[in-house]
Amino acid sequence: QNKPAVLVLPTMREIADMTETLRSVGLKPFAPTGAANGVYDGDFAVLNAQMAPADRYRAYLAISCGQVRCVLGTRAAMYAPVEGNALFLILDDVCYQDADGMMPYANARGVLRLRAKSHNGVFVAMANARSAQSQWETDAAHVGDTQVSGFSTPIHALPAVTKEASPWIRWLNRDELARLADPTIGARVPHTAVRILSKALETGPVLLSIPQDGITEALSCSKCHRQVRCARCTGPLERLADGTIRCRWCGAATVQWSCPTCHNERMRVVRVGAAGTAMELARLFRGVPMVLSTPSQPRGVVSDIGFAPQLVIATPGAEPRVRGESPAQCEYRAVAILDAWTSLYASGIDADVDTLTGWMRAVSLCAPRTRGGQALLIGETDPVLARSLMLWNSPMLAQVEVEDRAQTALPPVFAAACVWGRRDAVGTMLKRIGALAGGDMDTIDTIAGTMPSVLGPVPIPQPRTIDSRELEGTADRVKAVVRVPQGRRAELALRLRSASARHVASREPGELRFQMDPKERI
């Protein structure tokens, strides 16, 4: 339809994949034509922060004058100067790469949606797993034309197409292994999985997806192993150096804790990590070539592998692509997701959606069931997560997320803003915007009843920048979350901007910043 198009992708790996796809259908990238006069031409241009300044500015000019009407890029492409009723697309609309780390902390999703509204264009949010934000916006009860967005509608793949294109996905939890009479129940890789993966290795590569490298700690019930959460805001709890237990989100102290599931009163620390996975798997699959692809390894992320029997161990986002001579040789014969239980202890507000996105991304590299592809989810996890993966139905999880956030007064059902900086500066800003006791934004009405609009403030680490070290050693840098109904989101933003401007204009001491709807609340 001769419309300009802007596509924002998470990383350069996705840009390279999309560039190769566009080349395969006859489109050319913006590059020198080889003529003596040094002319550049092409059907699409790439914008990203890794480009040389001259190349980036040349592509920017070609886009602004209309020479190139299709733009690919990372977050930097959200400001591509296209005109007319353009098509604005974003892949993985809740990934952390979409958020700008500089003031005013613009998010690629919000910028593209606003531009689509202003240009009378179309905004499309694509992802392996639907985000809670997209689910809420496409809900019939919330669809409408606002100042920053137009009407939204959900798009689903047809069930018949999904079934044919996806592999056979099985969840090997304790109940399923007991039904199969597997003698290795409780093993990290049970005998049933070893047998399936060994058979798949006879005809091609096999992918094993493991959690991110590194060690993190989480508190869980010592009996049922469910993650310990705050009774006030459902945030994750942490144990401080002095033994005190508090919420990471609202800072509330926890005493006389009791598990709501099994009524146990004892906690345990769970350390989540992936060290030593390659050596452990080498003993299970002797004589099989192995490829390790993680950002922390000396070799780093492996971009691609050949179609040959080999075992590939990769963390989410670092899965190598399979390169072969035909489409049937550009896929893994089987995919296994190890340590599914780590999903029970993730602490981010989008933790389940991020987990499902990573699982679906890995499984999408597997051969479809029509060509014998199988995917295994190994370990205990939330049944909703497992069913969403097995049925390839991410809206199932997204709907549960929206319902949970309606009860806990969290975005997208409610609007939220983070305020952080020196303790007295944060307190002054909260008072000026009316979020403290006695103000007109001090409480919110939720399904569970009326509750304070502010979570926190809680202490946060000192910044890494040299020019903000005046609070070093004082533990006086804090963060708070302010929540309001979506109808008052614009009002909250204006109040925060006004209070921040007053802080700067009056030369009041101390760091003070705010951000609307950040991915990580605390």
Residue ranges of predicted features:
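Conserved Walker A/P-loop ATP-binding site and its immediately adjacent core
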Residues: 4-26
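Conserved motor-coupling elements within RecA-like helicase/translocase cores
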Residues: 36-71, 284, 291-314, 319-325
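Conserved helicase ATPase motor motifs in RecA-like P-loop NTPase domains
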Residues: 96, 101-142, 146-158, 212, ...
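Cys/His-rich short segments
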Residues: 188-192, 196-286
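Conserved RecA-like ASCE P-loop NTPase motor core of nucleic-acid helicases/translocases
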Residues: 3-11, 45-47, 206-211, 420
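Conserved interdomain linker/interface between the two RecA-like ATPase lobes of SF2 helicase motors
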Residues: 1, 124, 128-222
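SF2 helicase catalytic motif II
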Residues: 77-119, 331-346
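Accessory helical-bundle/CTD segments and flexible terminal tails appended to RecA-like ATPase motors
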Residues: 1, 153, 158-181, 285, ...
